[in-house]
Amino acid sequence: MNNIIIKCINLNKSYKDGDFTYTILKNISFQLNKGDIAGIIGKSGSGKTTFLHLLAGLENPTSGDILFNGRLFSSMSSNKMSKFRNIELGFIYQFHHLMLDFNILENVSMPLLISNKSKKDSEEIAYNMLKKFNLEDKIKKYPSELSGGERQRVAVARAFINKPSLIIADEPTGNLDEDNTNIIFNLITELNSDYNTSFIIATHDPTLIKKIPVLFKIENNQIFNYES
């Protein structure tokens, strides 16, 4: 049985600006096993976010292949890729990206509604997820009424609501203090343990870096195993 959830083969990404070509990533080979938690570190501007966008199918590589559970991204139409992202991938960002005009229950249930679940079923599943995260008393509140740590916990709940195989997180604790960083990482490890969810986390946060079991560093357009 193939234990690899996502794999990159000779991945390259560059951008053209007139006659000049900017190389962002060069000959990247990378793989993540199912159930692994991996961190991506590197200086600002090193290509971490671009790499995450490629892994999520939000951008196309200049050349090279990405396979998810053995399936080539390049074999999917844009419509199939959108459906794939909603079911198989979850996303957590530095800024929570919650919809400010919707309450917490509505925010978390949104990916389920997009998957054509009924409003009743979506809200029931979302409520149970928020209860798991000790947020059931916040379901009618709006993002502006929550603390930063609470908003990010809601963002994690939304990312996991479809029980994706892989969650991609870009600086998920960048705006949090150490206590809330620990809360978020504890949620990540709980989801990983309970559901075998894989995580790829780009971060500068030293508290988080110390906790992530496997680290990779992007430097000089390439990716390396990193020993902290």
Curated annotation (Swiss-Prot):
Q: Which CDD domains match?
A: ABC_MJ0796_LolCDE_FtsE (cd03255)
Give UniProt keywords alphabetically. Answer: ATP-binding, Cell inner membrane, Cell membrane, Membrane, Nucleotide-binding, Translocase, Transport
Q: How does it sit in the membrane?
A: Peripheral membrane protein
Pfam families reported for this sequence = ABC_tran
- Residues annotated as domain ABC transporter: 6-228
* Amino-acid positions noted as binding ATP in the UniProt annotation, renumbered to this chain: G42, K43, S44, G45, S46, G47, K48, T49
Q: What is this protein called?
A: Lipoprotein-releasing system ATP-binding protein LolD
UniProt source species: Buchnera aphidicola subsp. Acyrthosiphon pisum (strain APS) (Acyrthosiphon pisum symbiotic bacterium)
